[in-house]
């Protein structure tokens, strides 16, 4: 039988049967006939997943029906054949979540319902999940029925479908319950791969690489060579091909080869060892560790991705054990990476997909302990001995200690080296020479076989980058020991896709910057530039001098982030101009080498002139010139000009072979181990003839320190002095070997005397500030160092007196790590060195050498902390405020500076100070507008460079008029800085500008100016504050709460998400209003009891960004709580058009600019939209959501997993909303949520069901439940409840325990506190009660406050002082006031609680005064007055001080009491006893607030009344005009007192005592419940005196 192309398929024998059938087009043209003719049955059951069902099942049903009918009609049998066989189909949700006991049972029950019998044939159509699980169903159903595999993924084709392993997953791990059950057929139809997503295809390549790595070196080489072609085809979008099914046509032969190759190997091994007795273990290479990773990270990480990382770790383990050569490890890693598979758990994609979930080593080892290959407790791992070969023909026994070292992020080095040890160590190839050799060979013509190339992160980045630029092709020989580079003579092209990511490879970044300038645009014209970028540290390292030199030679280079650092965009100009190039070479010699190596390809011969002082690291420049000569270009050093070089034009001629000398910097570490331990070490291939300056280390550093040094032209041997007898060097200039200073420093730490090292200033701008790093980390050993301008001074200690460091931090710097490993071998104590793997930059196998060659014992360890370094971090970056003049920039800037504790600077004011003139006069002078703008830009750039942290700068309104200023601001945003646009309504701006004479007059209409500047303001800023607060009289305005919240968010100081995660129940109210403006009275009531408010943008009447900005600003000012910004599409249950992705993205950008706390992003949005939002989110939290309003997804199976996984990838919070039809749906949801939280506890989940029957899920959700409110026009979703309703339900379920609250004191019978709190409890749905406990004896309340159901208490006279000793803690406010009026139980552990005493009397006073117009900020100083000296007086003083009033006068009869009170407060309160009347004096702070604390009934002392009258009648000063003057009466009855009447007659405002009662109770309620009612509600309850409803 033939396939679609007319050819016969390829058959592979397994277990004596040719049951594996491979070709294109089998599914519709071959499978049905083969089944009917060779595996007959009355019932065929096709089981697949819901993703594949619609794609492949209908067509197969048609083909099956036709073939079955034809077979029946063509039969001539007598009697006639039975009726045609039936074909049943069943679909399950896709993903690893379906590979479970529940799904298996569901399928089995369905098979029984369909009356399937033992002759049934099951067809498993799908990937590994389907094949594994359906195979297990077949193995157990009716005690075993026949089944066939139809793998649709590459991984299933080459691995899981072959061999008869079937299984399901359990909580303990993958595939732990299953059976060996061989399929009767395995139909491998390669056409399925055309529709396989790229990630799934790449996932399968891990198994292909694995098979070649253990079995076939030739096939492995083919995989290396074919990686670019395979990836290119796989990543071609289906839409880009004329026929989507032809996407992989260019690699069809390659595909068939790799599938056949892998399938044949597996079939051979299975045939020899079906039940995994030994040989079949080899197929588990990478799986022992990989399966453990997968068990922890499933289902977010795919099997092949976990195995890829597992292969790397198991290869590193083989290297650590001395079995596998480092070059083979490097080759395997490069091959895996070339297929875009992860090679580390730190891979950014894995981190994002798993929500940053870690794989603790202890858990990984525990997962590995249940591996089926193990024998008892002995772990068995497949160890490679070479590419294509294993150490044993089975898995090998490996101790946990060795595994732990390889898995751990840190290593604890145990001191001790065997006395008399003599070793030979060959370090890896020189990093400097390796990188130069790669550049030269790629730019050269013809093949070049490079030997001893360094296999490290740096060279990997270089190789990958050259490959992307199509500068050369690469292949490996001699098991990865030789790299063959086929250079293309300088023909390079800008990369068509992606940027050049260089990690922290500084050498590569400098060299490739100039190489990128040689690139031409890509052949398709799509790529006209090259972007070079790196990790966070790389983005701080300098490259400015090199960029300046290239720019001066005609190359356009753009900084995409921080000025003078990566990332940069280099135009593909096809080469730079040449001629004379001047370069500052005092920072890095790599700048010089970069230009030297690329110079032959310039458009004219180059003369390179080094300026600015003596070039740094001259030996490295000499090395570059010597190597260029080896490749056929002879550089001439000028004989007439200092530091000048002449480079001819030409093309490098590649030598047939080039051997990279071992790295002399790396060689210093084994030599230093010998030196510090008194042993002997020989480096056989570095001597006096070396090109490298560091080769002088042994002679110029170690010999003076007391070592015996023997050095020939090609080798170096060092023998250290007896232990503890190293001698310090008074001074050594290490400028020729700067990288080696770290090694010298650790030796100096245990040498006698003081060693001074100079000439190493460039080491401050390497991977870290190495000089400071050595000083700080040596201090942990008790070694004292001094930093010098260009070096370090180390005072040695005896090695026996070294202190034990808690840990050594390595700054992600390989040389720091290796240097401290040297010191660790003689430390009196074991030393924990963090960031073990950073040595991979130059010597990936260093720890293996230290362990295997020097015999140093070490243990892998997971540190408790990841860093001991502290810094200001990005949160302290200076902020630039821009906007129109009069928009409130200075006010907002001062607010920011105040709340963040930073320095405010107005750049216009600073410019006037520097030029000693006003801006209007400057513009009128010969300087003019042009000169002013020039000064303005210069000042802006200076502030960005010299004050990058700790400042808030207010810029002039016209700063954006200058292109250079706009470029600087845009660059600042890109580099992670904050530029804030402040805006308010234009009418307010006009009002201000019409009377502002401090700036030049407008020469055109203001609105025209704003319209012109508006797009510039937008592009120059990344945050925007639209203010309803910034009035004309800005100096008198206090910072609004919403602005403080905004600033907290954009500067990374918001803690809201952390706070709500800690709460047992939290809510957000969903607004369903078309315009916030029309509901300003409703919204404050609707948000009560919620922790956030959701703005349903899709429900607004206008979706324009301008309208939405105003809506967000108004909502933020109204409700003063975090905002959830939601654009819900139609298909997700909202009203925003599904197809308007651009509109949705524009709105998301509005949200991020406005610094909202949460943005809801639907997971059905296109990937590019989601990626754009998540990359730009800053400190905004993403709620990754998916809604199923049609109820098509079930919580019982794995249907929700694909959405959960995607949400976990992108979200800080996950929101999944289904539909409920039965109560069971709610319980299934709860089970799903519990399981997901157990797997990823750091990522909270909102999971609930819509519909009436889904209300229970809302009650039980717990975290951030969406709610409605009676005041809103409609609920946002079917079944949505109010927060109060949910609390009522929770109390019925005992999820909110009923608490008892009290009022303590005497007399209290007339107190209105019970009605206040009981009403508020009822309104918010809380089950609590508040009652009076009248007593004047504090002992009578002790049992009550320690009861388990005690919820809190109000305390009044006479117990406010007596209660304090009975409490566990007192707030600072209550301590200062000296009285407690509120008791708050604070949970601590397991039902226990501490009692905290607080005082809300002063809070009530402050709130009442603010409501009356009093602010804490005023135009000029003002004083306050307290009448009386009783218990309330102290709270009144505290309240006035908190509002900034000073001095504070006390009017009272008893002078002694006043003195006592005054002396008990800090002097800064400035409390004065007012005797008699208060007379006006020049410059005095006039009183603006009087608080009366004396009884309102009975006679008041005449002296007090006279003093009060003198205060009330004191004339208001001109500067105080407009300030509120208020008397606050603390007495409750009568409602209008004599004191209030006097104040009113004097023109003062008054506040009755009941307001304070209501306010202090309002604050108490918030402290007890964390719910903030509308104040007017509390006030109304108290004022109206409604009867107690309880």
UniProtKB/Swiss-Prot annotation:
Region (3-dehydroquinate synthase) residue ranges read 1-400
Signal peptide span: none
Query: What are the start and end residues of every segment in region (EPSP synthase)?
Result: 413-856
Region Shikimate kinase, annotated ranges: 876-1070
Gene3D superfamilies reported in the protein's UniProt record: 3.40.50.1970, Aldolase class I, Dehydroquinate synthase-like - alpha domain, Enolpyruvate transferase domain, Leucine Dehydrogenase, chain A, domain 1, NAD(P)-binding Rossmann-like Domain, P-loop containing nucleotide triphosphate hydrolases
Q: Which reaction does it catalyse?
A: 7-phospho-2-dehydro-3-deoxy-D-arabino-heptonate = 3-dehydroquinate + phosphate; 3-dehydroquinate = 3-dehydroshikimate + H2O; shikimate + NADP(+) = 3-dehydroshikimate + NADPH + H(+); shikimate + ATP = 3-phosphoshikimate + ADP + H(+)
Q: Which UniProt keywords apply?
A: Amino-acid biosynthesis, Aromatic amino acid biosynthesis, ATP-binding, Cytoplasm, Kinase, Lyase, Metal-binding, Multifunctional enzyme, NADP, Nucleotide-binding, Oxidoreductase, Transferase, Zinc
E.C. no: 4.2.3.4, 2.5.1.19, 2.7.1.71, 4.2.1.10
What's the record's note on cofactor binding?
A: Binds 2 Zn(2+) ions per subunit.
Task: Name the residues that bind 7-phospho-2-dehydro-3-deoxy-D-arabino-heptonate.
Answer: 143, 159, 165, 175, 207-210, 266, 280-284, 287, 303, 372
Task: Name where it's found.
Answer: Cytoplasm
Question: Where NAD(+) is bound, by residue?
Answer: 49-51, 96-99, 127-129, 132, 152-153, 174, 192-195, 203
The answer to keyword NADP applying to this record is: yes
- Residues that coordinate or bind ATP: 883-890
Bridged cysteine pairs (disulfide)? none
- Span list, region Shikimate dehydrogenase: 1298-1590
| CDD domains per record | DHQase_I, DHQS, EPSP_synthase, NAD_bind_Shikimate_DH, SK
What the entry lists under PANTHER family is as follows:
AROM/DEHYDROQUINATE SYNTHASE (PTHR21090), PENTAFUNCTIONAL AROM POLYPEPTIDE (PTHR21090:SF5)
Q: Which family does it belong to?
A: In the N-terminal section; belongs to the sugar phosphate cyclases superfamily. Dehydroquinate synthase family.
Task: Please give the subunit comment from the record.
Answer: Homodimer.
Q: What is this protein called?
A: Pentafunctional AROM polypeptide
Q: Which organism is it from?
A: Pyricularia oryzae (strain 70-15 / ATCC MYA-4617 / FGSC 8958)
């Amino acid at each position: 039988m033939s396939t679609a192309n007319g050819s016969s398929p390829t058959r592979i024998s397994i277990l004596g049967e040719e049951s594996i059938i491979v070709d294109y087009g089998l599914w519709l043209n071959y499978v049905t006939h083969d089944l009917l003719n060779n595996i007959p049955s009355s019932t065929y059951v096709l089981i697949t997943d819901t993703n594949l069902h619609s794609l492949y099942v209908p067509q197969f049903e048609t083909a099956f029906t036709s073939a079955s009918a034809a077979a029946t009609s063509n039969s001539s049998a007598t009697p006639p054949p039975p009726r045609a066989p039936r074909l049943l189909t069943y679909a399950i949700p896709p993903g690893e979540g379906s590979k479970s006991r529940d799904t298996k049972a569901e399928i089995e029950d369905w098979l029984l319902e369909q009356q399937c019998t033992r002759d049934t044939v099951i067809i498993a159509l799908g990937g590994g999940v389907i094949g594994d699980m359906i195979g297990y169903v077949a193995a157990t159903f009716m005690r075993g029925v026949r089944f066939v595999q139809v793998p649709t993924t590459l991984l299933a084709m080459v691995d899981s479908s072959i061999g008869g392993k079937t299984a399901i997953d359990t909580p303990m791990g993958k595939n732990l319950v299953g059976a060996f059950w061989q399929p009767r057929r395995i139909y491998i139809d390669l056409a399925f791969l055309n529709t396989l997503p790229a990630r799934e295809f790449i996932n399968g390549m891990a198994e292909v690489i694995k098979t070649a790595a253990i079995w076939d070196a030739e096939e492995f080489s083919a995989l290396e060579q074919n990686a670019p072609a395979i990836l290119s085809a796989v990543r071609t979008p289906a839409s880009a091909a004329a026929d989507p099914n032809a996407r992989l046509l260019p690699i069809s032969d390659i595909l068939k080869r790799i599938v056949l190759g892998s399938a044949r190997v597996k079939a051979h091994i299975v045939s020899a060892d079906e039940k995994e007795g030994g040989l079949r273990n080899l197929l588990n290479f990478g799986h022992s560790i990989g399966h453990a990773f997968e068990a922890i990270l499933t289902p977010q990480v795919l099997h092949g991705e976990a195995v890829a990382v597992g292969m790397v770790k198991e290869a590193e383990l083989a290297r650590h054990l001395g079995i596998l050569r480092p070059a083979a490890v490097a080759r395997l890693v490069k091959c895996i990476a070339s297929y875009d598979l992860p090679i580390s758990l730190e891979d950014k994609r894995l981190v994002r997909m798993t929500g940053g979930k870690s794989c603790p080593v202890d858990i990984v080892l525990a997962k590995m302990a249940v591996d089926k290959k193990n024998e008892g407790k002995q772990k068995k791992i497949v160890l490679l001995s070479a590419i294509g070969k294993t150490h044993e023909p089975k898995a090998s026994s490996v101790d946990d200690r060795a595994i732990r070292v390889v898995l751990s992020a840190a290593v604890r080095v145990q001191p001790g080296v065997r006395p008399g040890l003599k070793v030979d160590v060959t370090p890896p190839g020189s990093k400097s020479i390796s990188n130069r050799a790669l550049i030269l060979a790629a730019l050269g013509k013809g093949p070049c076989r490079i030997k001893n190339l360094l296999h490290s992160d740096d060279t990997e980045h270089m190789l990958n980058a050259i490959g992307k630029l199509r500068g050369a092709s690469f292949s490996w020989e001699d098991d990865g020991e030789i790299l063959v580079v086929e250079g293309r003579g300088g023909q390079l092209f800008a990369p068509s896709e992606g940027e050049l990511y260089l990690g922290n490879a500084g050498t590569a970044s400098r060299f490739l910057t100039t190489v990128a300038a040689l690139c031409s645009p890509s052949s398709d014209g799509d790529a006209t530039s090259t972007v070079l970028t790196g990790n966070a540290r790389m983005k701080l390292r300098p490259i400015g001098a090199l960029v300046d030199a290239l720019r001066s030679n005609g190359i356009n280079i753009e900084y995409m982030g921080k000025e003078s650092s990566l990332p940069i965009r280099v135009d593909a100009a096809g080469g730079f101009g040449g001629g004379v190039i001047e370069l500052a070479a005092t920072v890095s010699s790599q700048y010089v080498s970069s230009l030297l190596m690329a110079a032959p390809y310039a458009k004219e011969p180059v003369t390179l002139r080094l300026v600015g002082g003596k070039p740094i690291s001259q030996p490295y420049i000499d090395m570059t010139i010597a190597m260029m000569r080896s490749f056929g270009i002879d550089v001439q050093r000028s004989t007439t000009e200092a530091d000048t070089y002449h480079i001819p034009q030409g093309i490098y001629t590649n030598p047939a072979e080039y051997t990279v000398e071992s790295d002399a910097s790396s060689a210093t570490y084994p030599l230093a181990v010998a030196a510090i331990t008194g042993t002997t070490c020989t480096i056989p291939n570095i001597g006096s003839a070396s090109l490298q300056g560091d080769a002088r280390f042994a002679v110029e550093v170690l010999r003076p320190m007391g070592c015996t040094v023997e050095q020939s032209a090609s080798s170096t041997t060092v023998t250290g002095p007896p232990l503890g007898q190293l001698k310090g060097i008074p001074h050594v200039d290490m400028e020729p070997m700067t990288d080696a200073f770290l090694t010298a420093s650790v030796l100096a730490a245990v040498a006698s005397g003081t060693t001074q090292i100079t000439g190493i200033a460039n080491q401050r701008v390497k991977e870290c500030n190495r000089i400071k790093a050595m000083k700080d980390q040596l201090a942990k050993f008790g070694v004292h160092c001094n930093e010098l301008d260009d070096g370090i001074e180390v005072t040695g200690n005896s090695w026996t007196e070294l202190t034990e460091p808690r840990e050594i931090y390595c700054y992600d710097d390989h040389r720091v790590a290796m240097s401290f490993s040297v010191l660790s071998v003689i430390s009196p104590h074991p030393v924990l060195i963090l960031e073990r793997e950073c040595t991979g930059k130059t010597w990936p196998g260093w720890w293996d050498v230290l362990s295997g060659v020097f015999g140093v014992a070490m243990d892998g360890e997971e540190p408790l902390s990841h860093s001991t370094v502290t810094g200001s971090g990005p949160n302290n970056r200076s902020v630039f405020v821009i906007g129109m003049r009069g928009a409130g920039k200075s006010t907002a800037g001062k607010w920011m500076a105040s709340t963040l504790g930073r320095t405010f600077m107005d750049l216009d004011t600073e410019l006037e100070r520097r030029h000693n003139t006003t801006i209007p006069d400057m513009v009128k002078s010969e300087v003019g507008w042009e000169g002013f703008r020039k000064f303005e830009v210069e000042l802006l750039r200076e502030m960005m460079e010299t004050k990058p942290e700790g400042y808030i700068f207010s810029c002039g309104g016209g700063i954006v008029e200058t292109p250079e200023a706009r470029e600087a601001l845009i660059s600042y945003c890109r580099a992670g800085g904050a530029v804030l646009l402040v805006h308010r309504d234009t009418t307010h701006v006009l009002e201000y500008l019409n009377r502002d004479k401090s700036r030049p007059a407008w020469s055109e209409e203001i609105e025209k100016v704003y319209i012109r500047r508006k797009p510039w303001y937008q592009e120059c800023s990344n945050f925007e504050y639209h203010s309803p607060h910034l009035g004309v009289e800005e100096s008198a305005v206090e910072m609004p709460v919403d602005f403080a919240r905004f600033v907290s968010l954009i500067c990374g100081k918001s803690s809201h998400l952390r706070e709500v995660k800690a709460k047992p129940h939290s809510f957000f109210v969903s607004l369903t209003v078309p315009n916030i403006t029309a509901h300003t009275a409703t919204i404050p009531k609707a948000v009560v009891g919620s922790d956030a408010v959701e703005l349903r943008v899709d429900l607004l009447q206008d979706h324009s960004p301008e309208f939405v900005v105003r809506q967000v600003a108004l909502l933020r000012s109204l409700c003063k709580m975090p905002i959830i910004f939601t654009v819900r599409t139609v298909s997700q249950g909202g009203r925003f058009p599904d197809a308007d992705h651009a509109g949705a993205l524009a709105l998301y950008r509005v949200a991020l600019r406005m610094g909202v706390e949460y943005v809801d992003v639907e997971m059905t949005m296109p990937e590019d939209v989601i990626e754009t939002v998540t990359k730009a989110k800053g400190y905004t939290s993403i709620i990754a959501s998916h809604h199923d309003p049609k109820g098509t997804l079930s919580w019982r199976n794995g249907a929700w997993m694909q959405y959960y996984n995607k949400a976990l990838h992108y979200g800080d919070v996950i929101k999944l909303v289904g539909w409920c039809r039965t109560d069971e749906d709610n319980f299934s949801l709860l089970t799903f949520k519990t399981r997901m939280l157990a797997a990823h506890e750091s990522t909270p989940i909102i999971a609930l069901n819509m519909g009436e029957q889904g209300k229970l899920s809302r009650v039980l959700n717990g975290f951030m439940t969406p709610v409605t409110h009676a005041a809103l026009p409609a609920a946002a979703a079917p079944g949505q409840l109010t927060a109060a309703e949910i609390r009522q339900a929770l109390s019925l379920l005992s999820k909110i325990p009923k608490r008892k609250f009290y009022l303590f004191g005497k007399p209290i019978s007339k107190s209105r506190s019970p009605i206040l709190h009981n009403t508020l409890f009822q309104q918010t749905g809380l089950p609590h009660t508040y009652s009076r406990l009248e007593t004047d004896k504090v002992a009578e309340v002790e049992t009550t406050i320690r009861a388990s159901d005690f919820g809190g208490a109000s305390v009044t006279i006479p117990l406010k002082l007596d209660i304090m000793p009975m409490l566990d803690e007192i707030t600072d406010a209550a301590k200062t006031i000296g009285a407690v009026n509120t008791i708050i139980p604070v949970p601590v552990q397991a039902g226990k609680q501490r009692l905290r005493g607080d005082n809300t009397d002063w809070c009530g006073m402050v709130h009442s005064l603010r409501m009356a117009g009093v602010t804490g900020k005023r135009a000029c100083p003002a004083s306050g007055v307290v009448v009386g000296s009783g218990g309330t007086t102290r709270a009144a003083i505290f309240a006035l001080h908190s509002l900034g009033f000073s001095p504070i006068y006390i009017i009272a009869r008893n002078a002694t009491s006043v003195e006592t009170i005054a002396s008990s407060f800090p002097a800064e309160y400035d409390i004065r006893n007012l005797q008699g009347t208060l007379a006006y004096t020049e410059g005095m702070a006039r009183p603006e607030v009087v608080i009366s604390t004396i009884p309102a009934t009975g006679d008041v002392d005449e002296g007090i009344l006279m003093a009060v009258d003198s205060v009330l009648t004191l004339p208001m000063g001109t500067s105080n005009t407009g300030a509120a003057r208020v008397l606050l009466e603390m007495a409750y009855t009568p409602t209008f007192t004599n004191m209030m009447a006097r104040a009113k007659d004097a023109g003062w405002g008054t506040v009755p005592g009941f307001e304070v009662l209501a306010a202090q109770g309002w604050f108490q309620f918030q402290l007890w419940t964390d719910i903030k009612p509308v104040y007017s509600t509390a006030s109304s309850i108290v004022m109206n005196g409604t009867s107690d409803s309880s």
